C-alpha cells in the first residue's frame, strides 16, 4: 500500500515585485484567501512601503510575503509548526527574498514576551491565529503592551469573535468577508 502525502496547497502573491508568483502552503493550515489578502493591502497599502513587518501565526507566510512584494523593508515570520517554517523559508528562497525575511519556529506568545525590542521596531504586525481560539485575545493583549506608537496591527479573525477591549490599541477599521473579519488596530 502506498502512503502518499496529500499535496501542498498553492497560493499566488497578489501584487508587487513578485506578484503572480506561486507560494506553497503546508497541508492542514487555513491560508488567508487571496480576496482577503488583497483587501488587507487595500486598507494598509500606504503603510507597507519600507515597513518592518511581523507576521504572527504565519502559516505559509503569504501575508508577510505580500508585504515584502509590495515594498516592506523586512519581515519576521513566527509559527510554532516546523513544517510551516520550512515552507516559509522555501517560499522566501524561491521568490528571491531570503535576505529580507526571517522565519522563526516559536510559540507566538513566548516569542512576543522574549522579543520586546523586535516587536517595538515593527511598524506593521499581521496576525491570523486559529479562528474561535482564546489565542487571539491573548496575542492582542501582548501586542497592546509591546507595539510602538504609530504601529498598526491587522488581525484576521472569525467575524463572530469580538475583539477584546484593549488599553492602547484601538480598532480603526473592520471589514467582513463571509465568515472572516479583518480588523485594523492602531496605538492611540
Residues covered by each model-derived region:
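Class I S-adenosyl-L-methionine-dependent methyltransferase catalytic core
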Residues: 1-188
Amino acid at each position: 500500500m502506498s502512503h502518499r502525502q496529500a499535496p501542498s496547497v498553492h497560493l499566488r502573491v497578489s501584487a508587487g515585485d513578485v506578484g503572480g508568483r506561486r507560494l506553497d502552503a503546508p497541508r492542514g493550515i487555513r491560508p488567508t484567501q487571496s480576496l482577503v489578502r488583497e483587501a488587507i493591502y487595500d486598507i494598509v497599502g500606504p503603510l507597507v512601503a519600507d515597513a518592518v513587518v511581523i507576521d504572527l501565526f504565519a502559516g505559509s507566510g503569504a501575508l508577510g510575503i505580500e508585504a515584502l512584494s509590495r515594498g516592506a523593508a523586512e519581515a519576521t515570520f513566527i509559527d510554532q509548526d516546523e513544517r510551516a517554517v520550512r515552507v516559509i523559508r522555501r517560499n522566501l528562497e524561491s521568490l528571491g527574498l531570503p535576505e529580507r525575511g526571517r522565519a522563526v519556529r516559536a510559540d507566538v506568545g513566548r516569542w512576543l514576551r522574549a522579543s520586546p525590542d523586535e516587536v517595538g521596531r515593527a511598524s506593521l504586525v499581521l496576525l491570523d491565529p486559529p479562528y474561535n481560539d482564546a489565542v487571539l485575545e491573548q496575542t492582542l493583549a501582548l501586542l497592546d503592551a509591546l507595539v510602538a506608537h504609530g504601529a498598526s496591527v491587522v488581525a484576521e479573525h472569525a467575524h463572530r469573535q469580538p475583539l477584546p477591549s484593549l488599553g492602547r490599541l484601538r480598532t480603526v477599521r473592520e471589514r467582513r468577508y463571509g465568515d472572516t473579519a479583518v480588523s485594523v488596530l492602531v496605538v492611540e
